């Protein structure tokens, strides 16, 4: 299925299960990393640990980027990544495509994967560990207040000596997972 302007694709497996974009990125990474010299794969701060773990396991180089279509598109090119994407489903192929997001092209790459592996969609994710996540929670705010709140959370995390990544809001890294608090770039939400 494609979104309204055709720049994203949603993948549904043969069992009727929706495949999130970061899982689709695992499928593509499994195809690209073993066969290309450039093994850099870009992902945004909302993607799961399963993706970064798989990129690393395959010998690839995970490259973290802030969330946002314009950021990930530019960073995929500027960081010289063969492939990049974000949790919202914008995907950028640079191995044999121009590097912009096209739902149609991403869908065709899925068809290509199915054809050359002769596997079912669900089988393309075999061996990926199950990580549990909460759905995105949006808290209404004002544009001014949302920035203040994220800054206060950053300050708290520093005071508590948490390991953080502050590329986009504050992502607290833990041994068995992470938590992210960021403000929306497109609306008055945290």
List PLM regions with ranges.
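Phosphate-binding and adjacent anionic-ligand microenvironments
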Residues: 34-189
């Amino acid at each position: 299925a494609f979104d309204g302007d055709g720049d994203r694709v949603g993948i549904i497996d043969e069992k009727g299960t929706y495949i999130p974009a970061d899982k689709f990125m695992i499928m593509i990474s499994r195809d690209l990393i073993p066969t290309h010299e450039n093994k850099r794969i870009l992902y945004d701060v909302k993607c799961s640990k399963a993706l970064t773990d798989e990129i690393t396991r395959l010998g690839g180089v995970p490259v973290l980027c802030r969330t946002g279509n314009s950021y990930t598109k530019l960073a995929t090119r500027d960081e010289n990544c063969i492939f990049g994407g974000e949790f919202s489903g914008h995907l950028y192929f640079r191995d044999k495509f121009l590097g912009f997001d096209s739902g149609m092209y991403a869908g065709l790459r899925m068809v290509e994967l199915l054809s050359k592996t002769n596997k079912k969609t669900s089988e393309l994710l075999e061996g990926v560990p199950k990580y549990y996540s909460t759905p995105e929670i949006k808290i209404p705010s004002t544009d001014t207040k949302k920035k203040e709140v994220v800054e206060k959370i950053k300050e708290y995390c520093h005071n508590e000596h948490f390991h953080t990544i502050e590329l986009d809001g504050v992502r607290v890294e833990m041994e068995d997972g992470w938590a992210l608090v960021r403000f929306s770039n497109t609306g008055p939400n945290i």
